[in-house]
Each structure stands twice: as structure tokens, then as C-alpha cells.
């Protein structure tokens, strides 16, 4: 009997600490963002997920021991009181990051633009949002297809000024642009 009571009390306390309690109806706490790349591009030429993460506009809150401790701490602060304890909670805590579909779409566009600038002109970036969780949490998965990178076929120079030709042509051995390299 005491075990059942202990489990019930623990369950009650955990539900009282829910960070999604104050989230408005129809909104979702951004829980996780992942980037998945297809494996069709060779590994040494593939853009890593770590490079792509910089272009995602929304990132989830920090976690502590698998919990949203920082969001919980932020929500425990009383906005009506201005004392050092509430100020400390607001300073250490983090405001909850809510899913914003316009930022999610913009992030997919940013990923596509970045892959284009790296020479992957036939790339694609899509996203999928999972809001099926009963606790008003959202997970976003970005899927990228990089394809084959474009390569530099040949290099030719067309000089109108002979003076510039005498300066540039002897220095072409030091150029970083070479035939066969990825157009980046």
C-alpha cells in the first residue's frame, strides 16, 4: 500500500512540474531538432549535420539530466516581483522555445541555399514536424538530399588588358581553383 502511495505522490509531483502546463493551447514546445542527410553523396564530400545546424533558425532549450530544468526554472519566477531570487531564476532559466512554422520553413530554405553555395545545386531540403506527443511537444526533422556536387571542368582566361595578363598568368600556379575540384 505504501508503494502505491509513494508512486502516486511521485506522479503528482512530476505532473506539477510540467513545463508544458503554461503553453497556450495549439502551441508546442520545441523538444528536438535533427538533421538527416541521404547517404548518396560520398562521405568525404558530404556536408555534415554539424555544418548544417548553424542554419537552423530555431533550436530547443538546453536540457539538464534529460529534463527541461531551465524552462521550469524560468517559469517558477514570478514576473510581478522584482527581487534577487526571481531575477536569478529569470537569468539562469530559459524562456520556452515554441514551434514557429515560419521559422521552420525558413530554416529549410537556409539549408537549401547553403548546400547550393557549397556546389550541391541539385540539393533538396524538407522538414517534418511530429506533434503527436500528448504533452504538447514538437520534434522537427530536416531531411537533406545533397546529390552530386558540381565540379570545375576547365579554367580559361580572356584578358582585354595585356598588362593584367602578365601579372595574373604567372600566379595561376598558386590559385585554389583547379579542374576537378568541387565548385565551392
Model-derived features with residue positions:
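Sec-dependent signal peptide recognition
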Residues: 2-7
Amino acid at each position: 500500500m505504501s508503494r502505491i502511495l509513494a508512486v502516486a505522490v511521485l506522479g503528482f509531483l512530476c505532473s506539477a512540474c510540467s513545463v508544458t502546463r503554461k503553453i497556450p493551447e495549439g502551441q508546442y514546445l520545441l523538444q528536438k531538432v535533427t538533421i538527416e542527410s541521404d547517404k548518396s553523396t560520398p562521405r568525404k564530400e558530404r556536408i555534415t549535420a554539424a555544418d548544417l545546424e548553424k542554419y537552423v533558425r530555431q533550436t530547443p532549450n538546453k536540457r539538464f539530466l534529460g529534463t527541461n530544468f531551465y524552462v521550469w526554472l524560468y517559469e517558477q519566477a514570478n514576473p510581478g516581483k522584482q527581487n534577487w531570487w526571481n531575477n536569478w531564476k529569470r537569468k539562469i532559466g530559459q524562456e520556452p522555445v515554441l514551434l514557429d512554422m515560419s521559422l521552420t520553413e525558413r530554416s529549410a530554405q537556409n539549408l537549401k541555399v547553403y548546400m547550393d553555395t557549397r556546389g550541391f545545386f541539385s540539393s533538396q531540403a524538407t522538414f517534418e514536424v511530429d506533434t503527436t506527443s500528448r504533452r504538447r511537444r514538437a520534434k522537427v526533422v530536416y531531411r537533406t538530399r545533397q546529390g552530386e556536387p558540381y565540379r570545375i571542368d576547365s579554367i580559361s582566361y580572356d584578358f582585354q588588358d595585356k598588362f593584367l595578363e602578365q601579372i595574373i598568368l604567372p600566379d595561376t600556379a598558386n590559385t585554389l581553383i583547379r579542374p576537378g575540384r568541387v565548385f565551392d
